[in-house]
Amino acid sequence: MMTKETIVAQATPIGRGGVGILRVSGPLATEVAKAVVDKELKPRMANYLPFKDEDGTILDQGIALYFKSPNSFTGEDVVEFQGHGGQVVLDLLLKRILQVKGVRLARPGEFSEQAFLNDKLDLAQAEAIADLINASSEQAARSALKSLQGEFSKKINQLVDSVIYLRTYVEAAIDFPDEEIDFLADGKIEGHLNDLIGQLDKVRSEAKQGSILREGMKVVIAGRPNAGKSSLLNALAGREAAIVTDIAGTTRDVLREHIHIDGMPLHIIDTAGLRDATDEVERIGITRAWNEIEQADRVILMLDSTDPDSKDLDQAKAEFLSKLPGNIPVTIVRNKSDLSGEKESIEEQEGFTVIRLSAQTQQGVSLLREHLKQSMGYQTGTEGGFLARRRHLEALEHAAEHLQIGRVQLTQFHAGELLAEELRIVQDYLGEITGKFTSDDLLGNIFSSFCIGK
Protein backbone atom coordinates (compact mmCIF):
# COMPACT_ATOMS: atom_id res chain seq x y z
CA MET A 1 0.00 0.00 0.00
CA MET A 2 2.17 2.82 -1.30
CA THR A 3 1.42 6.18 0.30
CA LYS A 4 0.92 9.32 -1.78
CA GLU A 5 2.60 11.40 0.91
CA THR A 6 6.29 12.06 1.39
CA ILE A 7 7.59 12.26 4.96
CA VAL A 8 10.83 13.45 6.53
CA ALA A 9 12.33 13.19 10.00
CA GLN A 10 15.63 13.25 11.83
CA ALA A 11 16.76 9.65 12.28
CA THR A 12 19.51 10.39 14.80
CA PRO A 13 18.88 11.62 18.38
CA ILE A 14 18.17 15.29 18.96
CA GLY A 15 21.31 17.15 20.10
CA ARG A 16 24.93 17.39 19.06
CA GLY A 17 26.83 14.43 17.67
CA GLY A 18 29.42 13.37 15.15
CA VAL A 19 26.84 12.50 12.50
CA GLY A 20 23.27 13.64 11.90
CA ILE A 21 20.87 11.85 9.54
CA LEU A 22 17.66 13.05 7.92
CA ARG A 23 15.46 10.40 6.29
CA VAL A 24 12.92 11.04 3.51
CA SER A 25 10.41 8.44 2.29
CA GLY A 26 7.73 8.67 -0.37
CA PRO A 27 7.09 9.48 -4.03
CA LEU A 28 8.83 12.88 -3.80
CA ALA A 29 12.08 11.51 -2.31
CA THR A 30 14.04 11.87 -5.56
CA GLU A 31 12.64 15.38 -6.07
CA VAL A 32 13.86 16.29 -2.57
CA ALA A 33 17.31 14.88 -3.40
CA LYS A 34 17.54 16.95 -6.59
CA ALA A 35 16.46 20.09 -4.68
CA VAL A 36 19.06 19.59 -1.93
CA VAL A 37 22.10 18.22 -3.82
CA ASP A 38 21.21 19.37 -7.35
CA LYS A 39 21.98 15.94 -8.77
CA GLU A 40 20.12 12.78 -9.72
CA LEU A 41 21.24 10.03 -7.37
CA LYS A 42 21.88 6.45 -8.45
CA PRO A 43 20.31 3.77 -6.23
CA ARG A 44 22.59 2.36 -3.52
CA MET A 45 25.50 4.62 -4.44
CA ALA A 46 27.04 6.85 -1.76
CA ASN A 47 27.57 10.42 -2.96
CA TYR A 48 29.65 12.96 -1.04
CA LEU A 49 28.02 16.27 -1.94
CA PRO A 50 27.18 19.73 -0.63
CA PHE A 51 23.65 20.16 0.78
CA LYS A 52 22.24 23.43 -0.56
CA ASP A 53 19.58 25.91 0.52
CA GLU A 54 16.93 27.16 -1.91
CA ASP A 55 19.16 30.06 -3.03
CA GLY A 56 22.17 27.79 -3.58
CA THR A 57 23.88 28.57 -0.27
CA ILE A 58 25.72 25.53 1.10
CA LEU A 59 24.17 24.41 4.39
CA ASP A 60 26.40 21.38 4.98
CA GLN A 61 28.20 18.65 3.11
CA GLY A 62 27.94 14.95 3.58
CA ILE A 63 26.72 11.69 2.09
CA ALA A 64 23.46 11.32 0.17
CA LEU A 65 22.01 7.81 -0.31
CA TYR A 66 19.09 6.76 -2.50
CA PHE A 67 17.16 3.50 -2.06
CA LYS A 68 14.71 2.91 -4.89
CA SER A 69 11.32 1.33 -4.21
CA PRO A 70 10.68 -1.47 -3.32
CA ASN A 71 14.25 -2.14 -2.15
CA SER A 72 14.17 0.08 0.92
CA PHE A 73 13.19 -0.15 4.57
CA THR A 74 9.73 1.35 3.95
CA GLY A 75 9.22 -0.20 0.53
CA GLU A 76 9.01 3.32 -0.94
CA ASP A 77 11.65 5.58 -2.49
CA VAL A 78 13.94 6.60 0.39
CA VAL A 79 16.70 9.22 0.51
CA GLU A 80 19.03 9.75 3.47
CA PHE A 81 21.18 12.81 4.06
CA GLN A 82 24.09 12.03 6.38
CA GLY A 83 25.80 15.21 7.51
CA HIS A 84 27.36 16.76 10.59
CA GLY A 85 25.54 16.25 13.86
CA GLY A 86 25.03 19.85 14.94
CA GLN A 87 21.36 20.46 15.69
CA VAL A 88 21.32 23.91 14.07
CA VAL A 89 22.71 22.47 10.82
CA LEU A 90 20.17 19.64 10.85
CA ASP A 91 17.31 22.05 11.53
CA LEU A 92 18.37 24.21 8.56
CA LEU A 93 18.50 21.16 6.30
CA LEU A 94 15.13 19.95 7.58
CA LYS A 95 13.64 23.37 6.89
CA ARG A 96 15.01 23.22 3.33
CA ILE A 97 13.47 19.79 2.72
CA LEU A 98 10.08 20.93 4.02
CA GLN A 99 10.13 23.74 1.45
CA VAL A 100 9.57 21.09 -1.24
CA LYS A 101 5.82 21.11 -1.83
CA GLY A 102 4.12 17.92 -0.66
CA VAL A 103 6.68 16.98 1.99
CA ARG A 104 5.67 16.93 5.66
CA LEU A 105 7.16 15.93 9.01
CA ALA A 106 6.74 12.27 9.89
CA ARG A 107 4.72 11.16 12.87
CA PRO A 108 6.43 9.02 15.53
CA GLY A 109 6.93 5.52 14.12
CA GLU A 110 5.60 6.42 10.68
CA PHE A 111 8.58 4.98 8.77
CA SER A 112 8.07 1.62 10.51
CA GLU A 113 4.32 1.89 9.93
CA GLN A 114 4.92 2.35 6.20
CA ALA A 115 7.24 -0.68 6.23
CA PHE A 116 4.42 -2.68 7.84
CA LEU A 117 1.75 -1.42 5.45
CA ASN A 118 4.00 -2.22 2.48
CA ASP A 119 4.63 -5.79 3.75
CA LYS A 120 8.31 -5.19 4.47
CA LEU A 121 7.71 -6.15 8.11
CA ASP A 122 4.88 -7.76 10.00
CA LEU A 123 3.58 -6.15 13.18
CA ALA A 124 5.65 -8.26 15.59
CA GLN A 125 8.81 -7.38 13.65
CA ALA A 126 7.91 -3.69 13.62
CA GLU A 127 7.44 -3.73 17.40
CA ALA A 128 10.82 -5.43 17.73
CA ILE A 129 12.49 -2.31 16.31
CA ALA A 130 11.36 -0.28 19.33
CA ASP A 131 12.24 -3.15 21.66
CA LEU A 132 15.76 -3.38 20.21
CA ILE A 133 16.27 0.36 20.71
CA ASN A 134 14.97 0.20 24.30
CA ALA A 135 16.68 -3.07 25.30
CA SER A 136 18.14 -2.82 28.81
CA SER A 137 20.43 -5.85 28.59
CA GLU A 138 22.50 -7.79 26.08
CA GLN A 139 20.07 -10.70 26.36
CA ALA A 140 17.07 -8.46 25.66
CA ALA A 141 18.86 -6.92 22.67
CA ARG A 142 19.69 -10.34 21.21
CA SER A 143 16.10 -11.49 21.70
CA ALA A 144 14.69 -8.31 20.16
CA LEU A 145 16.94 -8.83 17.15
CA LYS A 146 15.62 -12.37 16.78
CA SER A 147 12.08 -10.99 16.80
CA LEU A 148 13.07 -8.39 14.20
CA GLN A 149 14.51 -11.17 12.04
CA GLY A 150 11.17 -12.97 12.20
CA GLU A 151 11.78 -15.68 14.82
CA PHE A 152 8.57 -14.94 16.76
CA SER A 153 6.53 -14.38 13.59
CA LYS A 154 7.72 -17.72 12.20
CA LYS A 155 6.39 -19.54 15.26
CA ILE A 156 3.06 -17.71 15.03
CA ASN A 157 2.76 -18.43 11.31
CA GLN A 158 3.44 -22.12 11.95
CA LEU A 159 0.59 -22.12 14.48
CA VAL A 160 -1.68 -20.38 11.97
CA ASP A 161 -0.80 -22.99 9.33
CA SER A 162 -1.71 -25.76 11.80
CA VAL A 163 -5.02 -24.05 12.59
CA ILE A 164 -5.84 -23.68 8.88
CA TYR A 165 -5.02 -27.34 8.26
CA LEU A 166 -7.26 -28.42 11.13
CA ARG A 167 -10.07 -26.07 10.03
CA THR A 168 -9.92 -27.57 6.55
CA TYR A 169 -10.14 -31.09 7.96
CA VAL A 170 -13.04 -30.22 10.27
CA GLU A 171 -15.02 -28.38 7.61
CA ALA A 172 -14.51 -31.24 5.16
CA ALA A 173 -15.99 -33.59 7.77
CA ILE A 174 -18.96 -31.22 8.13
CA ASP A 175 -19.48 -30.85 4.37
CA PHE A 176 -19.41 -34.59 3.68
CA PRO A 177 -21.44 -36.14 6.51
CA ASP A 178 -22.55 -39.13 4.42
CA GLU A 179 -19.06 -40.59 4.07
CA GLU A 180 -18.61 -44.06 5.51
CA ILE A 181 -15.92 -42.81 7.91
CA ASP A 182 -17.01 -40.39 10.64
CA PHE A 183 -14.05 -38.00 10.55
CA LEU A 184 -15.20 -36.22 13.71
CA ALA A 185 -15.17 -39.44 15.70
CA ASP A 186 -12.22 -41.35 14.24
CA GLY A 187 -9.75 -39.67 16.61
CA LYS A 188 -7.65 -37.92 13.96
CA ILE A 189 -9.17 -34.48 14.52
CA GLU A 190 -8.81 -34.83 18.28
CA GLY A 191 -5.19 -35.88 17.81
CA HIS A 192 -4.44 -32.89 15.59
CA LEU A 193 -6.23 -30.62 18.07
CA ASN A 194 -4.19 -31.93 20.99
CA ASP A 195 -0.98 -31.46 19.00
CA LEU A 196 -2.01 -27.86 18.25
CA ILE A 197 -2.74 -27.20 21.93
CA GLY A 198 0.73 -28.53 22.79
CA GLN A 199 2.39 -26.33 20.15
CA LEU A 200 0.55 -23.27 21.42
CA ASP A 201 1.46 -24.00 25.04
CA LYS A 202 5.14 -24.15 24.06
CA VAL A 203 4.98 -20.81 22.24
CA ARG A 204 3.08 -19.26 25.18
CA SER A 205 5.82 -20.39 27.56
CA GLU A 206 8.53 -18.88 25.33
CA ALA A 207 6.50 -15.68 24.92
CA LYS A 208 6.09 -15.41 28.70
CA GLN A 209 9.87 -15.63 29.06
CA GLY A 210 10.28 -13.05 26.31
CA SER A 211 7.85 -10.70 28.02
CA ILE A 212 9.84 -10.93 31.25
CA LEU A 213 13.04 -10.06 29.37
CA ARG A 214 11.33 -6.99 27.93
CA GLU A 215 9.24 -5.73 30.84
CA GLY A 216 11.04 -7.18 33.84
CA MET A 217 10.13 -9.92 36.28
CA LYS A 218 7.85 -9.09 39.20
CA VAL A 219 9.23 -10.81 42.30
CA VAL A 220 7.24 -10.68 45.54
CA ILE A 221 8.95 -11.38 48.87
CA ALA A 222 6.47 -13.07 51.21
CA GLY A 223 6.53 -14.81 54.56
CA ARG A 224 5.72 -14.49 58.23
CA PRO A 225 6.64 -11.36 60.23
CA ASN A 226 10.33 -11.01 61.15
CA ALA A 227 11.47 -13.57 58.57
CA GLY A 228 13.81 -10.93 57.10
CA LYS A 229 11.80 -9.83 54.07
CA SER A 230 12.71 -6.15 54.34
CA SER A 231 16.37 -7.00 54.95
CA LEU A 232 16.36 -9.04 51.74
CA LEU A 233 14.75 -6.16 49.83
CA ASN A 234 17.53 -3.86 51.06
CA ALA A 235 20.21 -6.41 50.16
CA LEU A 236 18.89 -6.80 46.61
CA ALA A 237 18.35 -3.06 46.15
CA GLY A 238 21.78 -2.17 47.51
CA ARG A 239 20.34 0.52 49.77
CA GLU A 240 18.16 1.00 52.87
CA ALA A 241 14.85 1.02 51.02
CA ALA A 242 12.83 -0.50 53.88
CA ILE A 243 12.82 0.08 57.63
CA VAL A 244 14.20 -2.94 59.49
CA THR A 245 13.47 -3.55 63.19
CA ASP A 246 13.03 -6.50 65.53
CA ILE A 247 9.38 -5.55 65.98
CA ALA A 248 7.07 -7.96 64.16
CA GLY A 249 4.76 -6.27 61.65
CA THR A 250 6.99 -3.25 60.94
CA THR A 251 6.15 -3.42 57.23
CA ARG A 252 2.46 -2.53 56.85
CA ASP A 253 2.29 -1.60 53.18
CA VAL A 254 3.76 -2.71 49.87
CA LEU A 255 7.31 -1.49 49.11
CA ARG A 256 8.63 -1.56 45.54
CA GLU A 257 12.17 -1.40 44.21
CA HIS A 258 13.22 -1.56 40.56
CA ILE A 259 16.66 -3.10 40.12
CA HIS A 260 18.83 -4.60 37.38
CA ILE A 261 20.92 -7.75 37.61
CA ASP A 262 23.44 -7.78 34.76
CA GLY A 263 21.10 -5.47 32.90
CA MET A 264 18.04 -7.68 33.45
CA PRO A 265 15.12 -5.68 34.96
CA LEU A 266 13.43 -6.88 38.14
CA HIS A 267 10.59 -5.37 40.14
CA ILE A 268 11.15 -6.46 43.75
CA ILE A 269 8.18 -6.09 46.10
CA ASP A 270 8.32 -6.35 49.90
CA THR A 271 5.04 -7.16 51.63
CA ALA A 272 3.52 -7.22 55.09
CA GLY A 273 4.18 -10.33 57.17
CA LEU A 274 1.52 -13.01 56.69
CA ARG A 275 -0.31 -13.92 59.89
CA ASP A 276 -3.72 -13.67 61.56
CA ALA A 277 -3.59 -9.98 62.48
CA THR A 278 -5.93 -8.17 64.88
CA ASP A 279 -4.77 -4.68 63.92
CA GLU A 280 -6.95 -3.22 61.13
CA VAL A 281 -4.06 -1.46 59.36
CA GLU A 282 -1.98 -4.63 59.40
CA ARG A 283 -4.92 -6.63 58.03
CA ILE A 284 -5.20 -4.22 55.09
CA GLY A 285 -1.46 -4.62 54.49
CA ILE A 286 -1.80 -8.42 54.46
CA THR A 287 -4.68 -8.21 51.96
CA ARG A 288 -2.52 -6.06 49.73
CA ALA A 289 0.31 -8.55 50.12
CA TRP A 290 -1.86 -11.37 48.78
CA ASN A 291 -3.00 -9.18 45.88
CA GLU A 292 0.64 -8.67 44.91
CA ILE A 293 1.47 -12.36 45.37
CA GLU A 294 -1.32 -13.41 43.01
CA GLN A 295 0.08 -11.13 40.28
CA ALA A 296 3.72 -12.14 40.71
CA ASP A 297 5.96 -13.75 38.11
CA ARG A 298 7.85 -15.39 40.98
CA VAL A 299 7.44 -15.48 44.77
CA ILE A 300 10.28 -15.67 47.28
CA LEU A 301 8.97 -17.41 50.40
CA MET A 302 11.10 -16.31 53.35
CA LEU A 303 11.56 -18.74 56.24
CA ASP A 304 13.41 -17.99 59.49
CA SER A 305 16.03 -20.75 59.80
CA THR A 306 16.58 -19.86 63.49
CA ASP A 307 13.10 -21.16 64.35
CA PRO A 308 13.85 -24.18 66.59
CA ASP A 309 10.62 -25.92 65.58
CA SER A 310 11.16 -27.45 62.13
CA LYS A 311 7.52 -28.55 62.07
CA ASP A 312 6.52 -24.91 62.44
CA LEU A 313 8.57 -24.00 59.36
CA ASP A 314 7.04 -26.88 57.41
CA GLN A 315 3.59 -25.73 58.48
CA ALA A 316 4.32 -22.14 57.41
CA LYS A 317 5.43 -23.39 54.00
CA ALA A 318 2.45 -25.71 53.60
CA GLU A 319 -0.05 -23.01 54.60
CA PHE A 320 1.42 -20.55 52.14
CA LEU A 321 1.56 -22.99 49.23
CA SER A 322 -2.03 -24.11 49.83
CA LYS A 323 -3.25 -20.54 49.26
CA LEU A 324 -0.98 -19.81 46.29
CA PRO A 325 -2.25 -20.09 42.69
CA GLY A 326 -0.62 -23.20 41.27
CA ASN A 327 1.00 -21.57 38.25
CA ILE A 328 3.24 -19.12 40.17
CA PRO A 329 6.82 -20.38 40.64
CA VAL A 330 8.17 -20.23 44.19
CA THR A 331 11.72 -19.92 45.47
CA ILE A 332 12.20 -20.81 49.14
CA VAL A 333 14.77 -18.79 51.06
CA ARG A 334 15.94 -19.98 54.48
CA ASN A 335 17.18 -16.73 55.98
CA LYS A 336 19.49 -15.91 58.93
CA SER A 337 22.11 -18.54 58.12
CA ASP A 338 24.60 -16.43 60.10
CA LEU A 339 22.60 -17.15 63.27
CA SER A 340 21.41 -20.70 62.58
CA GLY A 341 24.79 -22.00 61.45
CA GLU A 342 23.43 -23.27 58.13
CA LYS A 343 25.91 -23.10 55.25
CA GLU A 344 25.02 -20.76 52.39
CA SER A 345 23.84 -22.96 49.53
CA ILE A 346 21.34 -23.54 46.75
CA GLU A 347 19.67 -26.87 46.01
CA GLU A 348 16.49 -28.45 44.67
CA GLN A 349 14.09 -29.94 47.21
CA GLU A 350 10.66 -31.41 46.43
CA GLY A 351 10.39 -29.43 43.21
CA PHE A 352 11.44 -26.09 44.74
CA THR A 353 14.72 -24.18 44.65
CA VAL A 354 15.86 -23.71 48.26
CA ILE A 355 18.49 -21.08 49.03
CA ARG A 356 20.19 -20.65 52.40
CA LEU A 357 21.52 -17.15 53.03
CA SER A 358 21.79 -14.23 55.43
CA ALA A 359 20.06 -11.07 54.24
CA GLN A 360 21.65 -9.17 57.13
CA THR A 361 25.28 -10.03 56.27
CA GLN A 362 24.48 -10.61 52.56
CA GLN A 363 26.25 -13.97 52.64
CA GLY A 364 24.58 -16.15 50.00
CA VAL A 365 22.63 -13.26 48.44
CA SER A 366 24.74 -13.67 45.29
CA LEU A 367 23.25 -17.17 44.95
CA LEU A 368 19.78 -15.65 44.93
CA ARG A 369 20.80 -13.00 42.40
CA GLU A 370 22.15 -15.66 40.04
CA HIS A 371 19.01 -17.76 40.52
CA LEU A 372 16.73 -14.82 39.69
CA LYS A 373 18.83 -13.99 36.64
CA GLN A 374 18.52 -17.55 35.33
CA SER A 375 14.79 -17.53 36.10
CA MET A 376 14.41 -14.55 33.78
CA GLY A 377 15.97 -16.45 30.91
CA TYR A 378 19.51 -15.07 31.11
CA GLN A 379 21.84 -17.06 28.87
CA THR A 380 25.60 -16.82 28.69
CA GLY A 381 25.71 -17.95 25.05
CA THR A 382 24.90 -15.87 22.01
CA GLU A 383 21.59 -17.63 21.32
CA GLY A 384 18.43 -16.16 22.79
CA GLY A 385 14.70 -16.46 22.42
CA PHE A 386 12.43 -13.71 21.21
CA LEU A 387 10.86 -10.72 22.93
CA ALA A 388 7.11 -10.58 23.44
CA ARG A 389 4.74 -7.86 24.60
CA ARG A 390 1.77 -8.03 26.91
CA ARG A 391 -0.64 -7.82 23.99
CA HIS A 392 1.06 -10.88 22.47
CA LEU A 393 0.56 -12.82 25.71
CA GLU A 394 -3.09 -11.80 25.85
CA ALA A 395 -3.69 -12.90 22.25
CA LEU A 396 -1.99 -16.26 22.92
CA GLU A 397 -4.02 -16.68 26.12
CA HIS A 398 -7.30 -16.03 24.28
CA ALA A 399 -6.27 -18.44 21.53
CA ALA A 400 -5.50 -21.15 24.11
CA GLU A 401 -8.88 -20.61 25.82
CA HIS A 402 -10.77 -21.04 22.54
CA LEU A 403 -8.80 -24.18 21.67
CA GLN A 404 -9.91 -25.66 24.99
CA ILE A 405 -13.51 -24.67 24.26
CA GLY A 406 -13.17 -26.28 20.84
CA ARG A 407 -11.92 -29.50 22.40
CA VAL A 408 -15.00 -29.61 24.63
CA GLN A 409 -17.25 -29.04 21.60
CA LEU A 410 -15.57 -31.96 19.82
CA THR A 411 -15.17 -34.51 22.61
CA GLN A 412 -18.35 -33.89 24.59
CA PHE A 413 -20.85 -32.61 22.05
CA HIS A 414 -19.47 -33.91 18.74
CA ALA A 415 -20.22 -30.42 17.38
CA GLY A 416 -18.03 -29.93 14.33
CA GLU A 417 -19.59 -26.58 13.38
CA LEU A 418 -18.85 -25.13 16.81
CA LEU A 419 -15.29 -26.48 16.73
CA ALA A 420 -14.78 -24.86 13.32
CA GLU A 421 -15.99 -21.52 14.72
CA GLU A 422 -13.61 -21.76 17.68
CA LEU A 423 -10.73 -22.46 15.30
CA ARG A 424 -11.68 -19.39 13.26
CA ILE A 425 -11.51 -17.28 16.44
CA VAL A 426 -8.12 -18.81 17.31
CA GLN A 427 -6.81 -17.89 13.86
CA ASP A 428 -8.00 -14.30 14.30
CA TYR A 429 -6.25 -13.95 17.68
CA LEU A 430 -2.99 -15.31 16.27
CA GLY A 431 -3.36 -12.96 13.30
CA GLU A 432 -3.51 -10.00 15.69
CA ILE A 433 0.09 -10.68 16.72
CA THR A 434 1.55 -10.37 13.23
CA GLY A 435 -0.98 -7.80 12.03
CA LYS A 436 -3.06 -10.01 9.74
CA PHE A 437 -6.20 -9.05 11.68
CA THR A 438 -5.59 -5.80 13.58
CA SER A 439 -7.72 -2.72 14.21
CA ASP A 440 -6.56 0.71 13.05
CA ASP A 441 -6.75 1.96 16.65
CA LEU A 442 -4.30 -0.71 17.79
CA LEU A 443 -1.92 0.12 14.95
CA GLY A 444 -2.05 3.79 15.92
CA ASN A 445 -1.24 3.01 19.56
CA ILE A 446 1.67 0.76 18.63
CA PHE A 447 3.43 3.04 16.16
CA SER A 448 2.82 6.25 18.13
CA SER A 449 5.11 4.88 20.87
CA PHE A 450 8.06 4.72 18.45
CA CYS A 451 10.77 7.34 18.05
CA ILE A 452 10.30 9.98 15.37
CA GLY A 453 12.43 8.91 12.41
CA LYS A 454 11.80 5.18 12.98
UniProtKB/Swiss-Prot annotation:
Binding site residues for (6S)-5-formyl-5,6,7,8-tetrahydrofolate: 23, 80, 120, 454
GO biological process: tRNA methylation; tRNA wobble uridine modification
CDD domains, A to Z: trmE (cd04164), TrmE_N (cd14858)
GO cellular component: cytosol
Keywords, ordered alphabetically: Cytoplasm, GTP-binding, Hydrolase, Magnesium, Metal-binding, Nucleotide-binding, Potassium, tRNA processing
Binding sites annotated in the UniProt record for GTP: 226-231, 245-251, 270-273
Annotated binding of K(+), by residue: 226, 245, 247, 250
The UniProt record lists the keyword Lipid metabolism: no
Pfam families on file: MMR_HSR1 (PF01926), MnmE_helical (PF12631), TrmE_N (PF10396)
Residue numbers binding Mg(2+): 230, 251
EC assignment: 3.6.-.-
Cell location: Cytoplasm
GO molecular function, one term: GTP binding
SUPFAM superfamilies registered for this protein in UniProt: P-loop containing nucleoside triphosphate hydrolases, TrmE connector domain
Primary localization class, coarse: cytoplasm
Coiled coil: none
Function of the molecule: Exhibits a very high intrinsic GTPase hydrolysis rate. Involved in the addition of a carboxymethylaminomethyl (cmnm) group at the wobble position (U34) of certain tRNAs, forming tRNA-cmnm(5)s(2)U34.
Family: Belongs to the TRAFAC class TrmE-Era-EngA-EngB-Septin-like GTPase superfamily. TrmE GTPase family.
Subunit structure and binding partners: Homodimer. Heterotetramer of two MnmE and two MnmG subunits.
Protein name as it appears in the record: tRNA modification GTPase MnmE
Taxonomic placement: Bacteria, Pseudomonadati, Pseudomonadota, Gammaproteobacteria, Pasteurellales
